[in-house]
Amino acid sequence: GRRIGNISSIITVWSVCSTNMMNSWVYRPLAVVESDDTCDRWDRNGMNFLFHWKAKYPKFKISLFTIPERTSEEMLELLWRHNDWVELCVHGWNHESNFECYGWDYDRTTRFMERVESLGVYKKIFKAPGWTITPGYNGYPADEKALISKDPQAVYKALTDKGYVIIDRHYNAPGRPENAKVVCIDDQDIVVHMHTWPMETGDKNGRNGYQQVVEEHGEPWDNNTEFYFMSEAWERGMFKPCQK
């Protein structure tokens, strides 16, 4: 087995997840359901909700943006048994903060993704913690000594060269290489974006933890909804281009 990261550290929450299509709770006849922060922690994996939804909505599918360093081989094996309705995508490496990718350059990004790929269970779909894949456009510049400051496009470039689809926010558009394969989540009315754990925010629509969705919003799908993985929606051309 491999070493699992320090899963007791706190993943910070900040207000970058503003109200938009990403945090809309209107009914979806077509749904690409995805969530952030799957890992081993009992209060961060949300397994009870996943099985509740699958039992209640037999067609249910979900793409889990999983923290590789914090997810054991045993957890991956358990999730892989359900790969007909659970898809594993990549959410940083250890998510020690929302600015993890500010500490990456091209080579470090490549090495992390090679380690992820060696496990053989993850789709080549990546989302940066806190959406901070490049500095500045989100209002949070990187320290000049940070690795990302040498080349603000380094993470994009490495992921693109390795064939990853990058899930991103609209405000990062000016910082992307033109050849990057990007899904701008702000523009996608078929995506249901959630977290495995409660988001304590004053923005009612931004309260998108699994339990909050059930108790405060209600699931924006039913048994007539057609569900697709992120990978399926990409392959079928279902995502809208970024509205730059």
Locate the predicted segments by residue.
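A cross-family glycoside hydrolase active-site/sugar-binding cleft signature
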Residues: 34-36, 63-67, 89-91, 127-129, ...
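Active-site beta->alpha N-cap acidic-glycine motif
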Residues: 14-85
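Short catalytic/ligand-binding loop motif for oxyanion handling, primarily in non-cytosolic enzymes
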Residues: 41-42, 72-74, 96-100, 132-137, ...
